[in-house]
């Protein structure tokens, strides 16, 4: 009987908590959305599967060595850690002390746990290498740059203003998060508010990069919100676009885009990087990788490298990025009131960004002879190319001969640049406080 009891106690089911059960269901929901509904499957599928692995009881695949030590509840080992942190020798007190400790102290405690015989889980290792270092989002940005054509933006530089206007959703959401905190509804710190705000840029890699730097404890919820709402762009944007434009405005036909020379396409990423990075060095990592990828594409002299970055490399990194995000889909981090706030603020951010882009297009039309169809303003959010396709679709509803896709790609690409710059602004000023 003792051996049977030991066997039963070793089963994961015997240790399954309510929080883990809920997170397993959430992970299965993400898998269903990815497979059945095709909602951002390239990211939601590995994120969902990573969530499943993270919430298997007793497996510890998403736990660091220190988290494994705390989960083991060995009184002697807890006393050693508590003595180093000058706190009470219980798990709750140790976690609170670690949250307030400097990164160097946290690393010391992690190394101490390793010395005691604990090892980090495989997903925790993925997270440390892919997101903790910031490498994975940067490599993906390089791949996005290699797949981006700046032609529509260069042919109509005014659309850069539409992409810039759409970033208003980011900063409005930061204020929204701080307002919730001010009124005591949901507690958000300034770094957390900044990380949540970047959802409004509709740029998954940027959201993950900034969250990893400013609010790693919210990364799972922010990434899920960002990619879920990106998939819902065709549902979120059209009602806002129709509400802010008249039938006459939606029928505006834009002039044919000029042909952009190869020299312009080669010079643009170099000039863009120098101009922005010299003024805002914190934006250099994201924008630098983006411009480097684009230069490989446009130069035409490294086709093998460009092809690798666009296909094999970005696909491999996407797998590890998704699994790493899934490592943060654990009950104690995800099942918090903050998650509801993130989901609410995320959809508001998308709405504000869409509206700001449309209104900026209308403003430009007041002082311009060559009219811009306001519908392309909504493409200023950097969900490439979905937002541009939505602009084209809504335009075709009003005028079946009015093809706006290439025109909308201008603000769409500008939105990618804008979100990278916004992330740089957040890093510079939030980390400085």
UniProtKB/Swiss-Prot annotation:
It is an enzyme of class 7 (translocase). It is a multi-pass membrane protein. The keyword Transport applies. It comes from the Bacteria. GO terms for molecular function: decarboxylation-driven active transmembrane transporter activity; lyase activity. It catalyses: oxaloacetate + 2 Na(+)(in) + H(+) = pyruvate + 2 Na(+)(out) + CO2. InterPro entries: OadB_MmdB. One of its GO terms (cellular component) is plasma membrane. Heterotrimer of an alpha, a beta and a gamma subunit. PANTHER family: OXALOACETATE DECARBOXYLASE BETA CHAIN 2 (PTHR35806:SF1). This is Oxaloacetate decarboxylase beta chain 2. It comes from Salmonella typhi. The gene is oadB2.
């Amino acid at each position: 009987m003792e051996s049977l009891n030991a066997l039963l106690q070793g089963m994961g089911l015997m240790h399954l908590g309510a929080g883990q059960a809920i997170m397993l269901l959430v992970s299965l929901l993400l898998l269903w959305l990815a497979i059945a509904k095709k909602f951002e499957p390239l990211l939601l599928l590995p994120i969902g599967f990573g969530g499943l692995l993270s919430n298997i009881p007793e497996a510890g695949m998403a736990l660091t060595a220190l988290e494994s030590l705390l989960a083991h509840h060995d009184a002697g080992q807890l006393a050693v850690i508590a003595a180093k942190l000058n706190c009470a020798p219980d798990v709750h007190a140790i976690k609170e002390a670690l949250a307030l400790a400097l990164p160097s102290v946290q690393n010391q405690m992690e190394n101490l746990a390793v010395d005691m015989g604990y090892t980090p889980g495989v997903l925790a290792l993925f997270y440390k290498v892919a997101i903790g270092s910031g490498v994975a989002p940067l490599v993906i940005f390089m791949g996005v740059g290699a797949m981006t054509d700046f032609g529509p933006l260069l042919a109509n530089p005014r659309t850069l203003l539409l992409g810039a206007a759409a970033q208003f959703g980011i900063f409005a959401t930061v204020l929204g998060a701080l307002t919730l905190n001010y009124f005591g509804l949901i507690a958000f710190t300034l770094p957390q508010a900044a990380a949540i705000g970047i959802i409004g840029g509709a740029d998954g890699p940027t959201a993950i990069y900034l969250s990893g730097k400013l609010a790693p404890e919210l990364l799972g919820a922010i990434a899920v919100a960002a990619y879920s709402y990106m998939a819902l762009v065709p549902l979120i944007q059209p009602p806002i676009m129709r509400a802010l434009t008249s039938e006459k405005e939606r029928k505006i036909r834009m002039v044919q885009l000029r042909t952009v020379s190869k020299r312009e396409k080669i010079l643009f990423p170099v000039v863009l990087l120098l101009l922005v990075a010299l003024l805002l060095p914190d934006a250099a990592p994201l924008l630098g990788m983006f411009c480097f990828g684009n230069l490989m594409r446009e130069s035409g002299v490294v086709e093998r490298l460009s092809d690798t970055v666009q296909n094999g490399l970005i696909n491999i990194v996407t797998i590890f990025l998704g699994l790493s995000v899934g490592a943060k889909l654990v009950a104690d981090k995800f099942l918090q009131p903050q998650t509801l706030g993130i989901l609410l603020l995320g959809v508001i951010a998308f709405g504000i960004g869409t509206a700001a882009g449309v209104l900026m297009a209308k403003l430009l039309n007041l002082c311009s002879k060559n009219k811009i169809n306001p519908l392309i303003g909504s493409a200023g959010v950097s969900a490439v190319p979905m937002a541009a396709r939505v602009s084209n679709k809504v335009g075709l509803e009003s005028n079946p001969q009015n093809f706006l896709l290439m025109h909308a790609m201008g603000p769409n690409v500008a939105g990618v640049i804008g979100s990278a710059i916004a992330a740089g602004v957040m890093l510079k000023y939030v980390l400085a406080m």
